[in-house]
């Protein structure tokens, strides 16, 4: 197969050679927005992230295989992929561990006042905080019980939490006390001290967390979003923070990125903002490479 690999896969020469050793021809392109280094019709497979934001998928007339370096499919014209019968794979499980660790760290940072202490350290100020909270025995609702959600559940369970889930496809899973269907979301939220979003962005989930969802959450809850920014109505979130409805929030993703300097979310003392960074981990490349080889061998 003739494969275009983009810089979205931060590969080394040995990895490209391993892909070629499976009988493939490989051509590399660093920036996905650049002019292609070959004719569209030459390409039978691509390893990419946002390539089709810049290049019309209809021009790839011989395309049979897409390997995404992202967990989400929202940067790909899935209607065309399905119509053309192209096999597509996401980076399933590649980023689950660092994202789950990030979610746990965010909640602990809020409960243990790390932002307060770090700011005092910068001022060389020795001030105690008597209002810290234990994570032990809290109920955590993970919305989206896929690979990332399951890794989150494992870690919160290990901290002594009761973990419940919400998913389009509920199932019995040892890492969750129960996984509710999506139509039970409000009930699950009303029983949770911590809510962690790990669900994908689809037309069904876009704007899912609106004014109503924040209203049904328990008073004093913690909200974590490591999924996609467009799942959340940021005006409703800001209102829930300013009213004191939420104890705090850890936000790694936003509707528009970078987050604008005029966003009120920057100004809350009880909000941790990170620049879509939760997926980063030192073992990602190794996991992604292994997954790519498995998928190539399987087609």
Predicted regions and their residues:
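Glycine-rich adenosine-cofactor-binding loop
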Residues: 7, 92, 136-157
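Phosphate-binding beta-alpha-beta segment of Rossmann-like dinucleotide-binding domains, i.e.
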Residues: 86-139
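Rossmann-like adenosine-cofactor binding region
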Residues: 170-264
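Redox-cofactor binding/interface segments in oxidoreductases and associated redox assembly factors
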Residues: 47-48, 68, 196-197, 225, ...
């Amino acid at each position: 197969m003739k494969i275009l690999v983009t810089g979205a896969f931060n590969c080394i020469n040995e990895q490209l050679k391993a892909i070629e050793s499976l009988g493939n021809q490989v051509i590399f392109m660093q920036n996905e927005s650049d002019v292609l280094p070959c004719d569209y019709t030459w390409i039978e497979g691509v390893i990419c992230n946002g390539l089709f934001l810049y290049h019309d998928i209809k021009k790839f007339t011989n395309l049979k295989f897409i390997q995404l370096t992202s967990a989400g499919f929202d940067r790909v014209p899935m209607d065309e992929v399905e119509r053309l019968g192209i096999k597509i794979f996401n980076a399933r499980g590649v980023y689950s561990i660092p994202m789950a660790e990030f979610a746990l760290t965010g909640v602990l940072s809020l409960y243990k006042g790390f932002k307060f202490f770090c700011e005092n350290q910068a001022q060389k100020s020795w001030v105690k905080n008597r209002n810290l909270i234990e994570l032990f025995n809290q109920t955590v609702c993970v919305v989206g019980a896929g690979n990332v959600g399951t890794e989150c559940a494992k870690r919160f369970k290990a901290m002594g939490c009761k973990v419940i889930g919400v998913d389009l496809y509920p199932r019995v899973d040892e890492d969750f006390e129960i996984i509710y269907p999506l139509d039970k979301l409000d009930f699950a939220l009303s029983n949770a001290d911590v809510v962690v979003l790990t669900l994908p962005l689809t037309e069904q989930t876009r704007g899912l967390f609106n004014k109503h969802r924040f209203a049904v959450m328990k008073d004093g809850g913690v909200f974590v979003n490591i999924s996609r920014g467009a799942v959340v109505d940021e005006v409703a979130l800001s209102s829930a923070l300013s009213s004191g409805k939420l104890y705090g929030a850890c936000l790694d993703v936003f509707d528009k990125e970078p987050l604008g300097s005029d966003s009120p979310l920057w100004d809350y003392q009880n909000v941790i903002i990170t620049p879509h960074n939760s997926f980063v981990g030192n073992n990602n490349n190794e996991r992604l490479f292994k997954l790519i080889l498995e998928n190539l061998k399987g087609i």
